[in-house]
Amino acid sequence: EEEKKFISLINEHQGLIHKVCIMYENDPDVRNDLFQEIVFQLWKSFSSFRGEAKITTWMYRIALNTAISGFRKQTRIVKTEDLKELHLNISDSWGDEREESIQRLHWAIRQLSEIERAMIMMALEEVPYDEIAETIGITQNNVRVRMNRIREKIKKLMRN
């Protein structure tokens, strides 16, 4: 019974997990591993979920903590090949400004800190500020201030 509830939950909210994986990992194989690790961590914590927060807030918290801790363990260094590939991907977009803008936005978001990435991802998902505050562990006012700074940072990165 518990397992059926969990599987249903994952099926219903797998998009949330995929978005966290995409935001924190470029390599598709590592992204799949991260997805599996997040599901595993959710399963380990599922029996202790008491419903004090919304289920999506709980899922975001575990997914982000898993992605961020995995990131810290591997301490990735951006390779010049990755930057060249990104540049080629952008220049090969045949003048499709929308596609280029999306790629530039993804690139800019990847330049943010782990917490900033988590916050902007939730904001793009239209998660209310009170839920972002609860997930990240800061006040709602602090979320507003940080979101303004993050938006400015992204604008600046996209201009350069």
Where are these regions (language model features)?
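Hydrophobic positions on the alpha-helical face of helix-turn-helix-like DNA-binding modules
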Residues: 38, 62, 119-120, 132-133, ...
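Short amphipathic alpha helix immediately N-terminal
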Residues: 111-131, 135
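Amphipathic, Lys/Arg- and hydrophobic-enriched alpha-helical face
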Residues: 9-28, 45, 109
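Structural recognition of an alpha-helix C-terminal capping motif at a helix-to-coil junction
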Residues: 33-40, 44, 53-65
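A short, charge-rich alpha-helical start-of-domain segment used by transcription regulators
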Residues: 1-19, 32, 55
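Arg/Lys-rich amphipathic alpha helix in sigma70-family domain 2
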Residues: 48-50, 61-81, 98, 149
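DNA-recognition helix of helix-turn-helix
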Residues: 136-160
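Internal acidic/polar
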Residues: 76-102, 128-129
